[in-house]
């Protein structure tokens, strides 16, 4: 499949079984899915902004995003129920592993003034979320062709029962946590 998946199967599963005292391979936590979300506040006034965000997310993820719509009207933000306000992609299978590898090996090292990712971003159930301020850290995005720099949220959903297990899993992939 991919090098990260092969590495997970051959090395990480055995290592985590020993560390967590599991008797079955099925108990070992794994990455279930990766969700990319790009909220576009200016989409309510200009439809072209949302189209460009969809193109960026398509290039980053390799699959067509789902356009998210406002659940309720908010007068302060000038949006009404049903207005398109962003886009999201859920990655599973081979695309999940390909993206995860590109995120760790290529994208995160390109973040300006990077000092490691916070360990406080776990949700209590073993899932990790991080925010990217600039989509240009991904090599698929051509800096000269983007209309504006926009960020995105990345959520890594795992089958881990606790934050400790999820941190062990992600650290096994050399995920750059802050010391």
UniProtKB/Swiss-Prot annotation:
Q: Give any GO molecular function from the UniProt entry.
A: tRNA binding
Q: Which GO terms describe its biological process?
A: translation
Taken from the UniProt entry, a GO cellular component term is: ribosome
| Keyword Ribosomal protein part of the UniProt annotation | yes
Give the InterPro entries listed for this entry. Ribosomal_uL5 (IPR002132), Ribosomal_uL5_bac-type (IPR020930), Ribosomal_uL5_C (IPR031309), Ribosomal_uL5_CS (IPR020929), Ribosomal_uL5_dom_sf (IPR022803), Ribosomal_uL5_N (IPR031310)
Write down a Pfam family by its short name: Ribosomal_L5
Keywords from the UniProt entry: Ribonucleoprotein, Ribosomal protein, RNA-binding, rRNA-binding, tRNA-binding
Record family assignment: Belongs to the universal ribosomal protein uL5 family.
Quote the subunit structure annotation: Part of the 50S ribosomal subunit; part of the 5S rRNA/L5/L18/L25 subcomplex. Contacts the 5S rRNA and the P site tRNA. Forms a bridge to the 30S subunit in the 70S ribosome.
Q: What does this protein do?
A: This is one of the proteins that bind and probably mediate the attachment of the 5S RNA into the large ribosomal subunit, where it forms part of the central protuberance. In the 70S ribosome it contacts protein S13 of the 30S subunit (bridge B1b), connecting the 2 subunits; this bridge is implicated in subunit movement. Contacts the P site tRNA; the 5S rRNA and some of its associated proteins might help stabilize positioning of ribosome-bound tRNAs.
State the NCBIfam families in the record: PRK00010.1
Stored PANTHER family:
60S RIBOSOMAL PROTEIN L11-RELATED (PTHR11994)
What protein name applies here?
A: Large ribosomal subunit protein uL5
Q: Which organism was this protein described from?
A: Buchnera aphidicola subsp. Schizaphis graminum (strain Sg)
């Amino acid at each position: 499949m991919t090098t990260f998946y092969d590495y997970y199967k051959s090395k990480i599963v055995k290592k985590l079984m020993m560390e967590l005292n599991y008797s079955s391979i099925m108990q070992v936590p794994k990455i279930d899915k990766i969700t990319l979300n790009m909220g576009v506040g200016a989409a309510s006034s200009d439809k072209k902004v949302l189209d460009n965000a969809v193109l960026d997310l398509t290039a980053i993820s390799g699959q067509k995003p789902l356009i998210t719509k406002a659940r309720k009207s908010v007068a302060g933000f000038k949006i009404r129920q049903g207005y398109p306000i962003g886009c999201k992609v859920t990655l599973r299978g081979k695309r999940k592993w390909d993206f995860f590898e590109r995120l760790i090996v290529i994208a995160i090292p390109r973040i300006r003034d990077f000092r490691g990712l916070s360990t406080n971003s776990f949700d209590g159930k073993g899932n990790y979320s991080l925010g990217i301020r600039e989509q240009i850290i991904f090599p698929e995005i051509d800096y000269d062709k983007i209309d504006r720099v926009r960020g995105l949220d990345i959520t890594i959903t795992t089958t881990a029962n606790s934050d400790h297990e999820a941190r062990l899993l992600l650290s096994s992939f050399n995920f750059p946590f802050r010391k």
